[in-house]
């Protein structure tokens, strides 16, 4: 399945500077059984009604509970949650 995390950071956040440390956190999730890949995509738009960052994870559906409880996921939330104005989480099966 695909797990999407789409993030809009708080106005004034230099979110482009956060790419490397956020990527480092999410790359650690690759050690969780059933997580196959992680991609980070930065927005190419500065429009205020656009989201800033998209994280795309390819995983087995059964890996989602382990991911939710994992140290990288909890660290992502504790270190960056205060910088997030809004986010969308979307899961889907691949065709």
Q: What positions do the PLM features span?
A:
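Non-catalytic alpha-helical scaffold/packing segments enriched in small hydrophobic residues
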Residues: 4, 21-24
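Short, conserved charged micro-motifs
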Residues: 13-19, 63-67
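Short, well-ordered beta-strand segments in beta-rich or mixed alpha/beta enzyme
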Residues: 2-8, 40-70
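An amphipathic, aromatic/His-enriched active-site/gating alpha helix that lines ligand/cofactor pockets
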Residues: 24, 30-33, 58-90
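Compositionally biased, intrinsically disordered low-complexity regions
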Residues: 7, 12-13, 29, 95
């Amino acid at each position: 399945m695909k797990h999407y995390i789409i993030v809009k950071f708080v106005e004034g956040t230099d979110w482009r500077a956060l790419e490397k440390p956020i990527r480092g956190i999410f790359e650690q999730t690759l050690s969780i059984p059933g997580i196959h890949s992680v991609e980070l995509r930065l927005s190419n738009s500065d429009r205020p009604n656009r989201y800033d960052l998209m994280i795309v994870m390819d995983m087995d559906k059964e890996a989602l509970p382990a991911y939710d409880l994992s140290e990288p996921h909890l660290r992502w939330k504790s270190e960056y949650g205060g910088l997030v104005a809004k986010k969308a989480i979307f899961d889907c099966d691949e065709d």
